Amino acid sequence: MSEELLSTRPSKRDYNDIEEPEDSHVTVHSVEQDSQHSGEESSTVDALQETEGDVDVIGEDEDEHDIPVMPTVTSSGEVLDESQVTPTKQASSSQPREEIIHGKGESVYSSFPCQVIPETLSRMTRTPPDGEHLEVYRMSNGRLRIYVVDHFKKFSPYSNLTHKPCTVCNRVMKSGEMHLNFPADLDRRRIWANLLGFKYKDILRSKMGPVSFSIAAGPICTEHFAEECFRNHNFNKSAIEAFGVPVAISPDVKTTPSKKSSRVPWVCTVCEFHSCSVVELQTHLLNHTEEMLKKKDNVLDVPEAGFMCPFCRKCTYGYKTISGYRRHLNAGPIHHCHLRRIYEFAKMNCRATELDPAESWDNWTRRNVYVAYHGCEPPANEIVLTPSPTKKAYVQNPEERTKMVHDEEKRKKAVRTLSFVGKEGGTSVNDLNVMQRQVFLQLRREAEINTKAEESAQGTKEQESSQKKHAEEESDDVSELTSHQSPQAPMGSGERRKATRLATSATNSPIKKVAKHEVPATAPSTPAKKRKISHEEEHDPTPESVEREPTVSPNDPRERLRLKERDEQFAKMVQKRSQQVKRLINAKQFKKQEAATKKPRKALAYNLAKGIAATSSTEPEDKVTSSEQTPEPTTSQKFIARNTRSKTKESAVQKVEKPATPVAKPAPVEKEPEERPLKSMLARSFVAGVRPSMAKYQIPLESFTATASLGGGRSLSSGVISRPPTSSSPGGIFSQRVMGAVAQEKGPAKRPSVLSRRPLILSPRKKTSTPRPTLSHHESSPNFSASSPVVVSDEYLIPATDMEVEMVEEVIDSMGNSSSEDVATSSTSSERQPMLTLAEALEMDGSSGTVKDQDMEEISKEMMKDAHYYRAMEDAIKCRTVTKMRADMRLSRHCIRQIEAARARARLFGERTEDYQIFYSNDGAQVLTKKDPKWRELQQQQQQQQQQQEQFPGQGSSDSQQ
């Protein structure tokens, strides 16, 4: 825009608005910035003049560089220090920023604007839509200062009761001054924050100590809103927060530059000229029309489509005469399609003051259009794109002109230069090819990876063979001699092994892949073949060790050091993963217990326990903890079943092994990977059974040895409860596991681990807490005796006297499980009887006559000594929610409520409620009160069955199974 044009109209710029970057070299900005608020108030001047008379809307004309960008004195009178005042600000720091108020105040009542239904506001803003009596003053910079009338007499959501700083510019607002808050709607809050110069993360709540702080909570002063915004929404605070926006540029705000740093210019339709300024192009086109009119002959070559307006859509027709074209260009900007859209968008965002008055072209400068549309200053390094060929000005030659507009080839070419994405105008053929190419590439990549993996697997097998041998030689050698490289290993494997040791992973662990010296590592041998090989190796162990010893001696200390380091590393890994392995072993053990044999084979027990014991006697530091013996009988049971078919072979192996001193040699343990190999390296090492022992690292796993799983009548005192062969009740398993854990727990500080299944309390009640009889409790209720269990066709009665109120759920658990598994186990253990006292109910499936009352008494005494036991149990019980219990047990709501009430009574008053009983039937658990007639029926049925069983004890138990 030219200087002359600027001087023809008074500048209405807000001098406090922009802080011009000092390095800004774009001269267009400094010229055009004079029009930021041109006509900011003109849209409302007429209305104002009725009420206020003459108002100085314009302000004084001042030189561009004397703009005070930030006041040196705040409204509260505090003077800013020199460091805060930039050279530009110092130029006219003598005058404070905004304290000059022009004219007298205007009284306004801010009723809610009628075009909006207030009920729709709740999501947009928290401010109530009520109106207030306001006093409006206009500042010298064109902004408004608004006060709530009588604010000192009443509370108003419009104003702060005290002096508060504005969140945006830190100007301290006076008491009673109107402020606005950020919208409640998150999208609009983000838009406001962007316009007010905040980043998105600034308006998120940040937790500072106990206080949750957010910029979006603070008040915003009226400086940051145009008068247009207040007028549009009738000064109503809630309407402005719901639908208005702050002004594009406001004092002390450096707005974030728009993401759109490139701009497509407007193009002249007559010549090659193009410009980003609407006014410039309009004057340029008017000049064209003047020249055309001046032509003497007045015979003009009118283009085929007519004279086109660059500010209107291409589809609109052109003007056939120059005068018509000129008239159209002189019409106001809002009569041109594209410009009208820009204006409406700006008005919607309360930024139309940048472009007002609507009929004037003067304000449509490059900067103002950008600010009105985007809401912030154009970036200093803005790129002006060259106009595309299709938008090029009309050429004088009509043939060329039609060719340019209608040339299909050109349009196709433009489309082709785009990428091949379908939406962007590329061909679908292209897309298909690309997709296919991608698929082929993917397949090829996978194939390559597979082949590489196979090669590396073969390589590592060889390396691991030598590595494994070294590990075992170390544990074998009595004279503390280890070989530098085993004779069976490939030539360079000694060097390679050093590198591979550190990177040993679960896939190529030394424990899993062991090389045989008869068979090459790559050829996998069948189990039968493997057995033969192992026999051969076992029969002549001595020559090998004899051969080895001479080669070893020279590099002995270094080798030992390296092996020691490797062992330490392995031990660290073991320590880290022992928990997971413990869980894995438990899971496998309990999953496969039915399928597996009752006793692990003796040979296997020997292999691990005695064999490693022998090793540890030779090398004191390689003593084996229970952690290594633990899983053998359980984890490898599947393996035993598969690979060691006959006891004779096993015993043969055992006999040959016994004399040999270096027991833990690679030979006896060579095993092919199973069909479904164990995932972790550690688990595999447990199955393999032999590796450098790690006693000094002490990673204890709770041992569960063969003796523990055998169980006998009196083995109970040791804390292990036996189970009948095929029963798999949770009660039995749990008792086995927990009691084992409790009995074998050495340190008093440790709490027994409560394992994955849900806990069942084995002692009927805490002996210490209540003086009532512990295990003879069933005699206290007249209907029951220990010898005669009562069954009502799958419906059990548990007297409330006989149980801890807290443990009701657990009882129901066990009852539910036992009743569901009744039928499954009936054929095998016909002598088992369902017991109805708590202790017996818990051991329902587990007790095949082995658990006597005295034994139970002993166990419970043992357990009561250990305070940790109850703590662990309670923890485990608390973990399970009532919802889970209900899902498991199908408890009726009523029953749950009753149980909860009973628990609460017990907790509060310590009373034992004996007026109800839990009645578990096929329909789910129910709570029966003694008043219920069904209670009597059940009692009678139980008594009858009791009598029957006394007469025919065998028949009674078989009945109960059905």
Curated annotation (Swiss-Prot):
GO terms for biological process: embryonic digestive tract morphogenesis. GO terms for molecular function: DNA binding; zinc ion binding. Residues 626-637, 939-951 have a biased composition (Low complexity). Residues 23-40, 452-472, 534-570, 647-658 have a biased composition (Basic and acidic residues). Residues 74-95, 952-962 have a biased composition (Polar residues). GO terms for cellular component: nucleus. It is found in: Nucleus. Residues 1-53, 74-99, 452-575, 612-676, 744-788, 932-962 are annotated as: Disordered. Expressed in vulval precursor P(3-8).p cells and their descendants, neurons of the head, tail and ventral cord, hypodermal and intestinal cells and germline cells. Keywords: Developmental protein, DNA-binding, Metal-binding, Nucleus, Zinc, Zinc-finger. Its main location: nucleus. Required to negatively regulate vulval development. Antagonizes Ras-mediated vulval induction. Acts cell autonomously. This is Protein lin-36. It comes from Caenorhabditis elegans.
